[in-house]
């Protein structure tokens, strides 16, 4: 009896196996059919310029400076290859390519200006669509010493630079004034020199001139005869004349 039941058991097992295999085949065919239908719908939308706009969001809206954040760009079109591009204002940041779904962009907020706005662009063939703007909110943390230091450091450097420039200007002005005084002193000294030279030349000329010849006179005394004066007087006057001979 056992031998008689064996074919029936084998046939039942083989029937279940075939049925399981057929179920898997049917499920696989159904999945392929749905995928092809979705792809056809997406391609039809693309051909009809019906590319949906992407959505840009983040898991956190309030951030601090120096914090790492992520932005997710997603679209309803999931069956075609899509190029996702991220923009900060009008500045291009990064691009990623995948078949539909969503992509994540990782950023680091270094200053308050990097809070936004951000945009995501999807590109399929010759079609493109932009997402809405997204902005982060900067948290006001008063207990952040590094933040205060980053704000004070530029002002401190600017103050040091101004002091250095003022000192350099004063030193240059003092040096220029001293140089001008030295030039004036030199010009005065050069102005007195010709007068001294002239006096020296005159003195030399006076000393080098030939001395004048000195002539000596020798007196010669002669006795002259007395002369009578008119009017008649008895007195006689004797006169002695002399001549100088050189």
From Swiss-Prot:
<keyword id="KW-0732">Signal</keyword>
<feature type="short sequence motif" description="ITIM motif">
    <location>
        <begin position="239"/>
        <end position="244"/>
    </location>
</feature>
<keyword id="KW-0597">Phosphoprotein</keyword>
<dbReference type="InterPro" id="IPR036179">
    <property type="entry name" value="Ig-like_dom_sf"/>
</dbReference>
<dbReference type="InterPro" id="IPR013783">
    <property type="entry name" value="Ig-like_fold"/>
</dbReference>
<dbReference type="Pfam" id="PF13895">
    <property type="entry name" value="Ig_2"/>
</dbReference>
<dbReference type="GO" id="GO:0043303">
    <property type="term" value="P:mast cell degranulation"/>
</dbReference>
<keyword id="KW-0812">Transmembrane</keyword>
<feature type="modified residue" description="Phosphotyrosine">
    <location>
        <position position="216"/>
    </location>
</feature>
<feature type="transmembrane region" description="Helical">
    <location>
        <begin position="151"/>
        <end position="171"/>
    </location>
</feature>
<feature type="topological domain" description="Cytoplasmic">
    <location>
        <begin position="172"/>
        <end position="246"/>
    </location>
</feature>
<dbReference type="InterPro" id="IPR007110">
    <property type="entry name" value="Ig-like_dom"/>
</dbReference>
<keyword id="KW-0393">Immunoglobulin domain</keyword>
<dbReference type="GO" id="GO:0033004">
    <property type="term" value="P:negative regulation of mast cell activation"/>
</dbReference>
<keyword id="KW-1003">Cell membrane</keyword>
<dbReference type="GO" id="GO:0005886">
    <property type="term" value="C:plasma membrane"/>
</dbReference>
<keyword id="KW-1015">Disulfide bond</keyword>
<protein>
    <recommendedName>
        <fullName>Allergin-1</fullName>
    </recommendedName>
</protein>
<feature type="signal peptide">
    <location>
        <begin position="1"/>
        <end position="33"/>
    </location>
</feature>
<keyword id="KW-1133">Transmembrane helix</keyword>
<comment type="function">
    <text>Immunoglobulin-like receptor which plays an inhibitory role in degranulation of mast cells. Negatively regulates IgE-mediated mast cell activation and suppresses the type I immediate hypersensitivity reaction.</text>
</comment>
<dbReference type="GO" id="GO:0005576">
    <property type="term" value="C:extracellular region"/>
</dbReference>
<keyword id="KW-0964">Secreted</keyword>
<keyword id="KW-0472">Membrane</keyword>
<feature type="modified residue" description="Phosphotyrosine">
    <location>
        <position position="241"/>
    </location>
</feature>
<comment type="subunit">
    <text>Monomer. Interacts (tyrosine-phosphorylated) with PTPN6, PTPN11 and INPP5D.</text>
</comment>
<keyword id="KW-0325">Glycoprotein</keyword>
<feature type="short sequence motif" description="ITIM motif">
    <location>
        <begin position="214"/>
        <end position="219"/>
    </location>
</feature>
<feature type="glycosylation site" description="N-linked (GlcNAc...) asparagine">
    <location>
        <position position="68"/>
    </location>
</feature>
<dbReference type="InterPro" id="IPR003599">
    <property type="entry name" value="Ig_sub"/>
</dbReference>
<feature type="domain" description="Ig-like C2-type">
    <location>
        <begin position="52"/>
        <end position="131"/>
    </location>
</feature>
<feature type="topological domain" description="Extracellular">
    <location>
        <begin position="34"/>
        <end position="150"/>
    </location>
</feature>
<feature type="disulfide bond">
    <location>
        <begin position="73"/>
        <end position="120"/>
    </location>
</feature>
């Amino acid at each position: 009896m056992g031998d008689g039941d064996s074919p029936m058991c084998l046939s039942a097992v083989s029937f279940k196996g075939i049925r399981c295999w057929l179920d898997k085949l049917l499920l696989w065919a159904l999945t392929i059919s749905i995928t092809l239908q979705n792809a056809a719908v997406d391609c039809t939308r693309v051909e009809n310029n019906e590319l949906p706009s992407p959505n840009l969001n983040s898991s956190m809206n309030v951030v601090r400076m120096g914090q790492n954040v992520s932005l997710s760009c997603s679209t309803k079109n999931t069956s075609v290859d899509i190029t996702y591009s991220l923009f900060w204002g009008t500045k291009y940041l990064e691009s990623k390519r995948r078949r539909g779904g969503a992509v994540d962009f990782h950023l680091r907020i270094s200053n308050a200006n990097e809070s936004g706005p951000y945009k995501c662009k999807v590109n399929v063939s010759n079609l493109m669509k932009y997402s809405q703007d997204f902005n982060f909110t900067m948290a006001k943390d008063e207990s952040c010493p590094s933040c205060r230091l980053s704000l004070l450091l530029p002002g401190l450097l600017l103050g040091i630079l101004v002091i250095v420039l003022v000192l350099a200007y004063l030193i240059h002005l003092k040096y220029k004034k001293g140089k001008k005084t030295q030039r004036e002193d030199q010009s005065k000294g050069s102005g007195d020199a010709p007068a001294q030279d002239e006096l020296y030349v005159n003195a030399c000329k006076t000393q080098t001139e030939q001395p004048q010849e000195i002539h000596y006179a020798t007196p010669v005394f002669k006795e002259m005869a007395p002369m009578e004066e008119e009017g008649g007087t008895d007195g006689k006057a004797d006169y002695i004349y002399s001549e100088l001979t050189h």
